[in-house]
């Protein structure tokens, strides 16, 4: 009996060892799987975090770009409004020049046009006020500009003169409107620089 008991004990001991070995291997495998799962989870969490940071940076850049565009758009709108006000004030000031000052300006504008036309006879066109002013001082005006002057039909303008050859084939537009238009881009740059640096 004793031999059978020894065999049973030996079988128990071997079985116990196998159980311990299997449990320890299972424990080791479980730890290994747990560690791999933790690393995968950490790696995935880092990837999600990187992706979120990238998306946040892209969104931040988009918001900044949109804000800059909005600021630029508003700045241009203000600039256009102010330039419009400056041009409007200039037109009002030119339209309200006192007669004596305006007469001398008309002489100067006409002489400038005569140089371009190179003719001894001219036809002047302008608004009603200008034509009446020149007509009331025609002898003085003709003498100052040095050519024969006749008056044409009135035109829509704030002032200045449209000077034509007698046959109307050549003309120099020295109305205030045309001169402002010719100077407008330069004036815009000057006003923009003065207002916005």
Curated annotation (Swiss-Prot):
<keyword id="KW-0375">Hydrogen ion transport</keyword>
<dbReference type="InterPro" id="IPR002842">
    <property type="entry name" value="ATPase_V1_Esu"/>
</dbReference>
<dbReference type="GO" id="GO:0042777">
    <property type="term" value="P:proton motive force-driven plasma membrane ATP synthesis"/>
</dbReference>
<protein>
    <recommendedName>
        <fullName>A-type ATP synthase subunit E</fullName>
    </recommendedName>
</protein>
<dbReference type="GO" id="GO:0046933">
    <property type="term" value="F:proton-transporting ATP synthase activity, rotational mechanism"/>
</dbReference>
<dbReference type="GO" id="GO:0033178">
    <property type="term" value="C:proton-transporting two-sector ATPase complex, catalytic domain"/>
</dbReference>
<dbReference type="GO" id="GO:0005886">
    <property type="term" value="C:plasma membrane"/>
</dbReference>
<keyword id="KW-0406">Ion transport</keyword>
<comment type="subunit">
    <text>Has multiple subunits with at least A(3), B(3), C, D, E, F, H, I and proteolipid K(x).</text>
</comment>
<keyword id="KW-0472">Membrane</keyword>
<comment type="similarity">
    <text>Belongs to the V-ATPase E subunit family.</text>
</comment>
<dbReference type="Pfam" id="PF01991">
    <property type="entry name" value="vATP-synt_E"/>
</dbReference>
<keyword id="KW-0813">Transport</keyword>
<keyword id="KW-1003">Cell membrane</keyword>
<comment type="function">
    <text>Component of the A-type ATP synthase that produces ATP from ADP in the presence of a proton gradient across the membrane.</text>
</comment>
<dbReference type="InterPro" id="IPR038495">
    <property type="entry name" value="ATPase_E_C"/>
</dbReference>
<keyword id="KW-0066">ATP synthesis</keyword>
<dbReference type="GO" id="GO:0005524">
    <property type="term" value="F:ATP binding"/>
</dbReference>
<dbReference type="GO" id="GO:0046961">
    <property type="term" value="F:proton-transporting ATPase activity, rotational mechanism"/>
</dbReference>
């Amino acid at each position: 009996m004793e031999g059978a008991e020894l065999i049973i004990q030996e079988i128990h001991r071997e079985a116990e060892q196998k159980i311990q070995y299997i449990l320890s291997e299972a424990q080791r495998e479980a730890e290994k799987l747990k560690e791999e799962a933790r690393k995968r989870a950490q790696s995935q969490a880092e990837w999600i975090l990187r992706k979120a940071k990238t998306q946040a940076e892209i969104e931040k850049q988009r918001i900044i770009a949109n804000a800059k565009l909005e600021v630029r758009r508003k700045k241009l709108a203000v600039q256009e409004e102010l330039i419009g006000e400056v041009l409007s004030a200039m037109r009002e000031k030119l339209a309200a020049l006192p007669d004596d000052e305006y007469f001398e300006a008309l002489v100067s504008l006409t002489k400038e046009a005569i140089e371009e036309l190179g003719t001894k006879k001219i036809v002047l066109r302008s608004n009603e006020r200008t034509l009446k002013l020149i007509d009331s001082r025609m002898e003085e005006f003709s003498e100052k500009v040095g050519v024969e002057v006749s008056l044409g039909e009135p035109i829509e303008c704030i002032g200045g003169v449209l000077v034509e050859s007698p046959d109307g084939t050549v003309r120099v537009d020295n109305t205030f409107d045309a001169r402002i238009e010719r100077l407008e881009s330069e004036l815009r740059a000057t006003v923009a620089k003065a207002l916005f640096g």
